[in-house]
């Protein structure tokens, strides 16, 4: 499936679930629940990447991306905003004469 189409469908799923009682606790105005969920999922990604199979890593990374998208929706951040920022960083990297990148280095 095309990535853009998949992201669009995922955004629609999140919008549809926003009013679901079980899911809506993540959207509570004064709640840190989504932030805690992202912390939990981030830890699970780290552990999976250290100890688990590729299948488990993909599963945990997918959970993290989903929860980040929920947070983005709660904060009124569109996926296009993130894509635009990534494009700016890419262009900045390409335009720099030095090899220093605006992306965090991977060690």
UniProtKB/Swiss-Prot annotation:
Its EC number is 3.6.1.31. Keywords: Amino-acid biosynthesis, ATP-binding, Cytoplasm, Histidine biosynthesis, Hydrolase, Nucleotide-binding. GO terms for cellular component: cytoplasm. Pathway: Amino-acid biosynthesis; L-histidine biosynthesis; L-histidine from 5-phospho-alpha-D-ribose 1-diphosphate: step 2/9. The keyword Amino-acid biosynthesis applies. It is an enzyme of class 3 (hydrolase). It is found in: Cytoplasm. The keyword Transmembrane helix does not apply. One of its GO terms (biological process) is L-histidine biosynthetic process. GO terms for molecular function: ATP binding; phosphoribosyl-ATP diphosphatase activity. Its main location: cytoplasm. It comes from the Bacteria. InterPro entries: HisE, PRib-ATP_PPHydrolase-like. It catalyses: 1-(5-phospho-beta-D-ribosyl)-ATP + H2O = 1-(5-phospho-beta-D-ribosyl)-5'-AMP + diphosphate + H(+). Belongs to the PRA-PH family. This is Phosphoribosyl-ATP pyrophosphatase. The gene is hisE.
């Amino acid at each position: 499936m095309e990535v853009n189409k998949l992201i669009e469908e995922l955004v629609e799923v999140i919008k549809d679930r926003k009013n679901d009682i079980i899911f809506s606790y993540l959207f509570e105005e004064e709640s840190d629940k989504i932030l805690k969920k992202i912390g939990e999922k981030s830890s699970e990604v780290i552990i999976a990447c250290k100890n688990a199979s590729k299948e488990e890593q993909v599963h945990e990374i997918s959970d993290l991306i989903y929860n980040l998208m929920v947070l983005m929706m709660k904060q009124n951040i569109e996926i296009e905003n993130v894509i635009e920022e990534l494009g700016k960083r890419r262009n900045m990297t390409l335009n720099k004469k030095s090899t220093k990148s605006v992306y965090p280095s991977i060690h």
